[in-house]
Amino acid sequence: MTEQALLLVNLGSPASTEVADVRRYLNQFLMDPYVVDLPWPLRRLLVSMILIKRPEQSAHAYASIWWPEGSPLVVLSRRLQEAVKPHWTKGPVELAMRYGEPSIEGALKRLAGQGITQVALAPLYPQFADSTTTTVIQEARRVIREHGLDLKLSILQPFYDQPEYLDALVASAMPHLQQGFDHLLLSFHGLPERHLHKSDPTGAHCLKGDDCCQRAEGAVLATCYRAQCIRTAEGFATRAGLRRDQWSVSFQSRLGRAKWIEPYTETRLDELAEQGVKKLLVMCPAFVSDCIETLEEIGDRGREQFIEAGGQELVLVPCLNTHEDWVQALVQLCSRAPQAL
């Protein structure tokens, strides 16, 4: 029987909190044309400007959440890899990061060197976006093509509405929901609006009306990040038995001056405090592993902002990380990954 390896891929992290390492990581991340979708000269100019001050600022943020073992995202991803191994009986389980180490190139070369010819590629992003899902797939294909590797890929599809994923979200969040709260904010990573327009296959649906995400279906839904985030939130809330007035959706991590998808998390934190919310739960379902965007942006800065605006307590619900239900769900989802053309 032919072995099939499983390659789990997450976003990545600097090698350390040193400014030089953070600058190197940010340069690789921001120079990805799927992330900053500008022509190369403009992208290089913009990234060079960002790299003047941002590495020092980001290094401080990383240092505030860094663990003795290293980057929380990388550590938690490795723990997930180890948790999955006993359940993936088809072959070895590798871990890679799209940016930084361990790299996709290194992982695929190791698998090819072991005589593996079939790989289930698992971008660990529940919702589709070119800046996450597509760039992982294209990087894997680049490595295979440029190094002449005899590898055939099966690719985990976005799983934003899959019952296994939603049930795992509910199971992981339920202990916090049961402790009582005034409101639940489901904060997803944001994207520039132009990314949604570019991924709309019709060129005439995304952001055309307040209910465009509710009306999205078929090919439009398959590539609309915002619509998929809303479907995740609705599926979670239904399974968790929440009333519609108990939760809302927002989008975080806005960068630069371009318009990003709304509502913004930083705006919602102030609004909810002003509306009298005292105990706020925040979940970040676009991330399966806790990282700087959850631990520092929400858990530290977001909490401080909410309390300064009049709230009393912000509870960050941990990501799925290595929750048993998530491990089982991930294995089931990857087992169904279709072979790429």
From Swiss-Prot:
Q: State the Gene Ontology terms under molecular function.
A: ferrochelatase activity; metal ion binding
Q: What is its EC number?
A: 4.98.1.1
Does the keyword field hold Cytoplasm?
A: yes
Query: What chemistry does it catalyse, as a reaction equation?
Result: heme b + 2 H(+) = protoporphyrin IX + Fe(2+)
An example GO BP is: heme biosynthetic process
Q: Provide the protein's localization.
A: Cytoplasm
Q: What class of enzyme is it?
A: lyase
Instruction: Cite the InterPro entries for this sequence.
Output: Ferrochelatase (IPR001015), Ferrochelatase_C (IPR033644), Ferrochelatase_N (IPR033659)
Main localization of the protein? cytoplasm
Q: Where is the signal peptide?
A: none
Biochemical pathway: Porphyrin-containing compound metabolism; protoheme biosynthesis; protoheme from protoporphyrin-IX: step 1/1
- Can you cite an annotated GO cellular component? cytoplasm
> Could you tell me which PANTHER family the record lists for this protein?
FERROCHELATASE, FERROCHELATASE, MITOCHONDRIAL
What role is this protein assigned?
Catalyzes the ferrous insertion into protoporphyrin IX.
In the record, the note on similarity to other proteins reads: Belongs to the ferrochelatase family.
Entry protein name: Ferrochelatase
